[in-house]
A protein has these predicted regions:
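RNA/tRNA-interacting regions in translation and RNA-turnover enzymes
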Residues: 1-190
Length: 190
């Protein structure tokens, strides 16, 4: 996984990967980055058992009760073939329409407004009352599944498998076979 912020960084990343692989063919899963609250979900036998924020990188907050109120996160995976234990990582987001609605309600009540959707999502997920969390209509997108024996080798295939199990994956993801395809993806979303 690599984050890039300019075409020059993309080109440099692509050439570095090409060199590291000794010229062997490879693909890149190009996708947009979401700016939300990082979350890690654990499913056991297809059932959501734990949701933890990234916290300080070592220790996060257990927000399982609140995550269970987010409609876009399945409490039980769909279909079959999922591993006994599955970890997926993603971002919890507050859509702009919800952000505006919540701030309008806060303004009417004389409460301080949230500065931005990311801070509002973070504050919402840490609420002690899951009913408040449910009322704010958070959303989630998943972007990473650690490699494991029961899953496909490629990042892209793992995400598509998770999508088949009902986890929300960005619609803005494309499997690119060349640097020009990566540029085309960037041009489309720029």
């Amino acid at each position: 996984l690599g984050n890039t912020y300019s075409y020059e960084e993309v080109d440099s990343f692509y050439e570095r990967v090409k060199k590291d692989l000794g010229g062997k063919p490879f693909t890149i899963a190009a996708e947009l980055k979401y700016d939300g609250l990082s979350i890690s979900l654990i499913y056991e036998e297809g059932i959501l058992v734990r949701a933890v924020t990234r916290g300080d990188g070592q220790v996060g907050d257990d927000v399982t009760a609140n995550v269970r109120t987010i409609r876009s996160i399945p409490l039980r995976l769909q279909g079959e073939g999922y591993p006994r234990e599955l970890e997926v990582r993603g971002e919890i987001l507050l859509p702009f329409s919800e952000f505006d609605r919540i701030n309008a309600e806060r303004s009417e009540a004389g409460l301080p407004l949230f500065a931005n959707p990311r801070n509002a999502a973070s504050g919402t997920l840490k609420q002690l009352d899951p009913a408040i969390v449910a009322s704010r209509r958070l959303d989630a997108f998943f972007y990473y599944v650690p490699a494991q024996p029961d899953m496909p080798d490629s990042h892209y295939e793992r995400l598509m498998q998770c999508k088949a199990w009902g986890l929300k994956v960005s619609h803005a993801i494309e499997l690119c076979h060349s640097l020009s395809e990566v540029h085309h993806f960037l041009d489309h979303w720029d």
